[in-house]
Curated annotation (Swiss-Prot):
Homodimer. ATP binds at residue 301. Its cofactor is Zn(2+). GO terms for cellular component: cytoplasm. The gene is metG. It is found in: Cytoplasm. PROSITE patterns: TRBD (PS50886). Its EC number is 6.1.1.10. This is Methionine--tRNA ligase.
Length: 645
């Protein structure tokens, strides 16, 4: 029986250049969720695409001597190739240059204008071209864009504006009455306290300083700005504003917009207010995941630390990359991408745990029974723990995915894999094989292992798409439905397993690290379009204390670390960059006492994990020798990011 429709979206990506591992992370996560929902009986619409208009695209195309459309066509082809390589199963790929989208956006703009929510005025301010955002002088950080750190330029032009303030109170009420609308919880507090409650300014929604965009139908010297153009894709892709709205009626409102935290404001303030003005339902949830950090910070061409997913897939395969992104990165928090950790994770989890379980089991079925699966006719109490764990794991996985806890879902599956490996050691099939009278027991043990592998194969299929197919081929099974996991009997006695290649060969860590280092892009000198760095010193140890880099930061959020009485998790503003810091100050400060405070951060300590949480620095504090009290160093309300000398 088909369950209710399920609609999941990624952001539509800006095709100014090729996508990196961070973009891939969002799309792989959405794909895993979409595949899981299909597996469990939902009719799914999984949408991704590209946001193809804007001044930056126009400038890049002019520099290349081609049209903007020629430029985006080239980049979009590469994006689609990447998604094919990563086994992304999107149902629709929308481009904002698609005719149906252009017409629908023009209708949306006109409707908002006709009902008085959009008006014409002029705008003067400081403009960031890469972010396509206007800023006031007071909003700048060190004279640069507060979102990306790049230079801004003065701009004045006639423009249309959307009356954001008209709907602000209504949106605040909606967010408060729908606690799951913005997730994780910390993101909701950020939107309410930093943007909505202080008051909203009306939003500029058209431009006249460039032409690469959707013209306003009744005033064609204006092009419709990114907010209405790009955000509307989530409904225009379903047919909103078109004659056939069957998909819109079936799938809207979206179950989840999956986005990076850097575009949360647009999706949780601009977009819902636009929908309110149109009289449409709001999406059920907007989930803002964290960033993928490389070398302790965000990826940047100027640092030469941008990770190319194509290189990784060509070297290690799509499933290895998918597994690391989905298992190792805490969904909702920042996570570390590190080549050495990645390779070691492939060796331990995929080659050792899963790969060895499969190869050992298939080899024993061939060695002792010529590859023929035996009926489980000689059960013993030791079997029950494995069987009961197998039967209970699908429910745990489903609950984790419903809560968007992807790493926890994979952890549950790997708990079963580990238990199966332990079961081999406990039952010692090689000893049973020496006793002819225990042949029936040996057959039962191997059946239990094969059936456990079948469970594993079904459950990993949304995450490791190619691996699941390979396991099924060696098990010689076609029983791959989610429903089949309700009983531990899907493996058919009398069938014959099939010998196959090792699914994850072990990797020589040093050799592959050297290859990756050789392929690493050289740092690019920052230009106007690149991030202006305020460089942090090299990573240090305590022995290098004289090199320590102290920075002023503002505490944005603070909460206890689970199962760690002494630790607090802080999100701090480093001046255009947010960081997560784990600090052992819980016995001295309550979380609510720290929010809004300015403190000093040791900014160039190597990122580490403490109790499973990423810590990107250390808060400076003073304490007497008996630790009877602890005082945080107070720099006063200096600009965030300022160095302490």
């Amino acid at each position: 029986m088909c369950k209710k429709p399920y609609y999941i979206t990624t952001p539509i990506y800006y095709p100014s250049t090729n996508l990196h591992i961070g973009n891939t992370y969002t799309t792989v996560a959405a794909d895993a969720i979409a595949r899981f929902k299909r597996l469990t009986g939902h009719e799914v619409m999984f949408l991704t695409g590209t946001d193809e208009h804007g001044q930056k695209i126009e400038r890049i195309a002019n520099e290349k001597g081609i049209t903007p459309k020629e430029h985006v066509d080239e980049i979009v082809a590469g994006i689609k190739d990447l998604w094919k390589m990563m086994n992304i199963s999107y149902d629709k790929f929308i481009r904002t240059t698609d005719d149906y989208h252009v017409k629908a956006v023009q209708e949306i703009f006109k409707k908002l204008y006709d009902q008085g929510d959009i008006y014409k005025d002029s705008y003067e301010g400081l403009y960031c071209t890469p972010c396509e955002s206007f800023w006031t002088e007071t909003q700048l950080v060190n004279g640069n864009c507060p979102d990306c750190g790049r230079p801004v330029e003065k701009a004045k032009e006639e423009a249309y504006f959307f009356k954001m303030s008209k709907y602000a109170d209504r949106l605040i009420q909606y967010i408060e009455e729908h606690p799951d609308f913005i997730q994780p919880e910390s993101r909701k507090n950020e939107m309410l306290n930093n943007f909505l409650r202080p008051g909203l300014q009306d939003l500029c929604v058209s431009r006249t300083s460039f032409t690469w965009g959707i013209p306003v139908s009744f005033d064609e010297k204006h092009v419709i700005y990114v907010w209405i153009d790009a955000l509307s894709n989530y409904i225009t892709a379903l047919g909103y504003g078109q004659e056939n709205q069957e998909l819109y009626k079936k799938f809207w409102p979206a179950d989840v917009h999956l986005i990076g935290k850097d575009i949360l404001r647009f999706h949780t303030i601009y977009w819902p207010i636009m929908l309110m003005a149109l009289g449409l339902e709001l999406p059920k949830q907007v989930f803002g995941h964290g960033w993928l950090l490389v070398d302790g910070g965000k990826m940047s061409k100027s640092k030469g630390n941008v990770v190319d997913p194509v290189v990784l897939v060509n070297m290690f395969g799509a499933d290895a990359v998918r597994y690391y992104l989905l298992r190792e990165i805490p969904f909702g928090s920042d996570g570390l991408f590190n080549n050495e950790i990645f390779i070691k994770k492939v060796n331990t989890d995929l080659a050792n745990d899963l790969g060895n379980l499969l190869s050992r089991t298939i080899a024993m079925v061939y060695k002792y029974f010529g590859g023929v699966i035996q009926a489980p006719t000689c059960k013993e109490p030791i079997d029950d723990e494995l069987i009961n764990l197998a039967l209970s794991t699908p429910g745990k996985v489903e609950a984790s995915i419903d809560a968007l806890k992807i790493p926890e879902a994979l952890e549950s599956i790997w708990t079963l894999i580990s238990r199966a490996n332990k079961y081999i050691d406990e039952t010692t099939p090689w000893i049973l094989a020496k006793d002819e009278e225990k042949k029936e027991r040996l057959g039962t043990v191997l059946y239990n292992l094969l059936e456990t592998l079948r469970f594993v194969s079904v459950m990993i299929s949304p995450f490791l798409t190619e691996t699941s197919v390979k396991i099924n081929a060696q098990l010689n099974t076609k029983v791959t439905t989610w429903e089949s996991l309700k009983e531990f009997n899907g493996t058919v006695a009398g069938d014959k397993v099939v010998k196959g290649d090792v699914i994850f060969p072990r990797i020589d860590v040093e050799e592959k690290l050297a290859e990756l280092e050789a392929l690493k892009p050289a740092p690019v000198k920052p230009a106007n379009e690149e991030l202006v760095e305020n460089p942090i010193k090299e990573e240090i140890t305590i022995d290098d204390f004289d090199k320590i880099d102290l920075r002023v930061v503002k505490v944005l959020e603070c909460e206890p670390v689970k199962k760690a009485k002494k630790l607090l998790k802080l999100k701090v503003d480093l001046g255009g960059e947010e960081r997560q810091v784990i600090s052992g100050i819980a016995q001295y400060y309550k979380p609510e006492e720290l929010v809004g405070k300015y403190v000093v951060l040791v900014a160039n300590l190597k990122p580490v994990k403490l109790r499973g949480e990423l810590s990107q620095g250390m808060i400076l504090a003073a304490a007497p020798s008996d630790d009877s009290e602890l005082l945080l160093v107070n720099p006063g309300e200096m600009l965030t990011g300022s160095q302490v000398r």
